[in-house]
Amino acid sequence: AATTAKNIIDNSGLYLTDEQISYLLHCFGELDQMADVILVDTGAGIANHVLEFVLASPEVLVVTTPEPTSLTDSYSLLKSLYRNPKFNREYTKISVLSNRVTSAAEGRGVYDKLNTVVGQFLEGEITYAGMIPQDSALEKAIRMQKPVSLQAPLSKSARAFEVVAAELLQGESSDAYRSFGLSRLFSGFWKQKNEGVE
């Protein structure tokens, strides 16, 4: 089956008016019928709007690299998530994707580091989603601002993305997502958020 990627919302679009939220929920409702998996890229960091979006999601995929700053940012996000009273450990599946690594062993090592500190200091549990190797095709695709899967579909990084995508498709969504779909999940989240403000 062909894979299609659509850019729906970026980090600049997370500050939304009520009208924009309604439109976004309408779009999510349509996407529920079209897509098996919907990925929302919130960008790095733990700003309130990023954390709120993550809290509304049934699955969280933390993308990190071997760089110490990236690992620190990833742990900071996870710490903020686990310590937030709105976070439901039973409802949310958290996975780690090791990006731009030199080997499968390094990718697993990145996950092991995060998993150790999450277990030790947050009493949490995260799973390993896989790894994306650093290669020249990936570097070129980044410079050209094109998906490596389209730019160089036979490259190691593109094949790794296919493996990760297949795993995501085979993974079980949470009961909440299966029952209500993405639009109902986010609708409930924004309703709770607005009630908390009033």
PLM feature spans:
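Conserved catalytic-core segment of NTP-binding enzymes
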Residues: Q33, V37, T42-G130
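Beta-strand-loop-alpha "switch" segments that mediate conformational coupling across diverse proteins
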Residues: T3, F121-S149, F161
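Short hinge/gating elements
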Residues: I9-D10, L97-N99, M144-Q151
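P-loop/Walker-type NTP enzyme "switch/lid" segment
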Residues: A1-Q33, I142-R143
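Phosphate/oxyanion-binding loops and surfaces in catalytic or ligand/nucleic-acid-binding neighborhoods
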Residues: V117, F121, D135, E167, ...
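NTP-binding/hydrolysis catalytic cores, primarily Walker-type P-loop NTPases
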Residues: P147-E198
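Alpha-helical scaffold segments in soluble metabolic enzymes
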Residues: H26-E30, S80, A160-V163, E167
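Amphipathic alpha-helical transducer elements in NTP-driven molecular machines
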Residues: D18-L25, P68-Y75, R108-Y111, A158-E162
